[in-house]
Amino acid sequence: MGRSITTRELYDEIEAGSVPMILDVRNQDEFAAWQVEGPRPVPTRNLPIWLAVEAVDDLVKEIPADSVVICAHGNGSDLLLQMLSDEGLSVRNLEGGTSAWAELLVPKEIPDLPDGFVAWQVQRPSKACLSYVVGVPGHEAIVVDPARFTDCYLDLASSHDMRITHVIDTHVHADHITGGPALAAEVGAAYHVPIEDTGRAPTPFANDPLPDGATIALGNAAVRIMSIKMPGHTPGSTCINLPGSFLLTGDTVFVRGVGRPDLTGKAEELATELYHTVHDRLAPLDPGTMVLPAHWSFANEIAPDGLVRTELAQIFDSALLSEADMTRFIEEILTSLPSAPDTYDTIRLVNSGRQAASADEIEFLEIGKNQCAASTTT
């Protein structure tokens, strides 16, 4: 009666609202650090495995049929599944557990683009991270803010006969390990990350930083991508302007809120930069510009079409971004900052090429959703 479910199948069921319950049998501290979440809320219960195996009789009465049992790697949850099945309850085991969920990438096609131009928002539910593939079928593509699991980007490019020519990190990320240098090396593409973030010391990867206003041609120059420097979250934060009034904003602004300016240890200085970015660089743009950020914080930031996006005008409706007084703007940001995770300094060092990390260390460093927003409303 027990059976397994893949990470993508679970995501699709969460999106459809058809998961009765998730029973997470990891330790309480692991559960507190992060849970399986998707585009819709799903009832979730935490009961460590050693308690769950002693409570099978009760669980058979309390857990709905077809619920999903999860653990770190899928072994303990499979044991519990068999015990519940023996008692007549049909549940499912998440293949690979939360370790596999951490690697799930879900591409969502972005509609309403100019003719001959395609793009996808690639969602990583475990981190609430967003990356992008943008290109012209039969020609070239760029990848922006890639996760370290690169097969999804390669598959999207290959399925549309596109060659990845540029890989861009909008800034040095603090919440996850980038796949940028590895992907660029694998496909022979140029890699771009702001030198203001990496520092000017030599890096172990080739880097061709994009200056403000740089353009990248795709499809025999039929489509041009432009970089726009927007410091604030980091000194070198860059947005990517796509044809048709689409703006990949990295961590500069989100659907709700702005990027926190304290992760490089220069909170007040970068909060000032962020004020000028908001009022001098973002405000003059077309209010109908579609903002496509690098993260989300809550499921209600996901639009009905499954994309994390909103118009620039809606972002400026928030009290923070509409605040014209620089002193109050900075004060509101600085007083809204939660403590940054201890791992963020290490992740920044790894992403800037100044420190190496093993696969096990990377998995540990990436535990938990991103905490990159300075101001976010639920």
Predicted stretch roles:
Residues 128, 141, 149-226:
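Active-site HxH/HxHxD metal-binding segment of metal-dependent hydrolases
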Residues 1-4, 82-87, 107-109, 276-378:
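Accessory terminal helices/loops
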Residues 1-21, 28-67, 73-133, 137-140, ...:
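Rhodanese-like catalytic fold shared by cysteine-dependent sulfurtransferases
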Residues 27, 111-160, 240-249, 256:
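Conserved beta-strand hairpin/beta-sheet module of binuclear metal-dependent hydrolase folds
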Residues 29, 73-76, 150-151, 172-178, ...:
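Active-site environment of divalent metal-dependent phosphoester hydrolases
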Residues 134, 145, 171, 183, ...:
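Divalent metal-coordination and catalytic microenvironments
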Residues 71, 143-144, 163-173, 192-195, ...:
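Active-site neighborhood of phospho(di)ester-bond hydrolases with catalytic His/Asp-centered motifs
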Residues 7-10, 119-122, 131-135, 215-247, ...:
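Core dinuclear metal-dependent hydrolase active-site scaffold
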